[in-house]
């Protein structure tokens, strides 16, 4: 998480900052959703192949092992290392990422509405803005 204070010369400048981040996040989300769709198809195919192999191994008598279970290793409190993820495991992580990006977009849109109110009154004052993950959380107006 990035946290900081940034100075903006006006509400208009802050709006441009928010709009730039919204544009970037929407592009990232669009790219990610395309990857997720591809992974969904791979995951479904992987699931059908595993079901077929399971059925065949029961009929043939000799067991087969897929050998592709992902190993998840915790590297500290907030970092995981996933070794050899199946498409469904990778899909789960990427869907979580897409949800996080979507929530950030919603927060930025809400912040933008608030800043628009400042811009509408023609406020021409310096703004010190507390940003948490590039989302404005507090604005100090300085005359």
Give the residues covered by each predicted segment:
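Residue-identity detector for glycine
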Residues: 4, 30, 60-63, 67, ...
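Charged/polar, solvent-exposed surface patches and flexible loops
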Residues: 16, 20, 24-27, 31-34, ...
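Coiled-coil termination/hinge junctions
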Residues: 45-55, 89-138, 143
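Short, glycine/alanine-rich amphipathic alpha-helical segment
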Residues: 69-93
């Amino acid at each position: 998480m990035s946290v900081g204070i940034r100075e903006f010369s006006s509400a208009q400048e802050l709006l441009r900052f928010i709009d730039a981040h919204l544009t970037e996040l929407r592009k990232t989300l669009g790219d990610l959703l395309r990857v997720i769709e591809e992974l969904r198809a791979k995951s479904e195919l992987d699931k059908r192949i595993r079901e077929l192999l399971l059925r065949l191994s029961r009929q043939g008598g000799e067991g087969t092992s897929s050998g592709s279970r992902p190993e998840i290793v915790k590297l500290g409190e907030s970092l995981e290392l996933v070794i050899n993820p199946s498409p469904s495991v990778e899909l789960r992580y990427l869907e979580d990422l897409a949800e996080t990006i979507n929530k950030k977009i919603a927060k930025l849109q809400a912040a933008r509405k608030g800043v628009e109110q400042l811009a509408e009154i023609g406020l021409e004052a310096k703004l010190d803005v507390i940003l948490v993950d590039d989302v404005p959380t507090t604005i100090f107006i300085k005359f």
